Each structure stands twice: as C-alpha cells, then as structure tokens.
C-alpha cells in the first residue's frame, strides 16, 4: 500500500510540475527584431524597461534573417 501511495504522489507532483512549466513558458514575449549591431545588452535593457526580468536575441522561427528580442520572466 505504501509503495502505491508513493508512486501516485510522485505521479501527481510530476503532472503539476509539467503544467506549471507550460504556464511559465507562456510569459516569454518577443518585442521586436534585433539588428546586427543591437546585441543582447540592448535587448536586455529594453525588456527591463518593459518590466520583464530580462531578455535576449534569439531566432524564434527557422529561416529568419534577424533574431527577435524576446523578453522573459525568471522561472524561479
């Protein structure tokens, strides 16, 4: 009985953790393209001004010519 209860508890915790991680990822938001000379520092500063925890230049879609400045909230 104790082993079954332990497995059920682990399963429930895993499901809840996965659902929380999915919701956290929804907070990422791209606010515009990064120019070649733009760099992560400027993107980070713009995201901080927009009340996010930070940001970085990243290619969101395959084949894009310029990366996007994507802001995020810390996952902690």
From Swiss-Prot:
Signal peptide segment: 1-26
InterPro entries according to UniProt: Defensin-like_dom (IPR056373)
Gene Ontology CC terms, in alphabetical order: extracellular region
GO biological process: defense response to fungus; killing of cells of another organism
Pfam families assigned: Defensin
Disulfide bonds: 30-71, 34-57, 43-69, 47-70
Entry's family note: Belongs to the DEFL family.
Protein name (record): Putative defensin-like protein 62
Lineage: Eukaryota, Viridiplantae, Streptophyta, Embryophyta, Tracheophyta
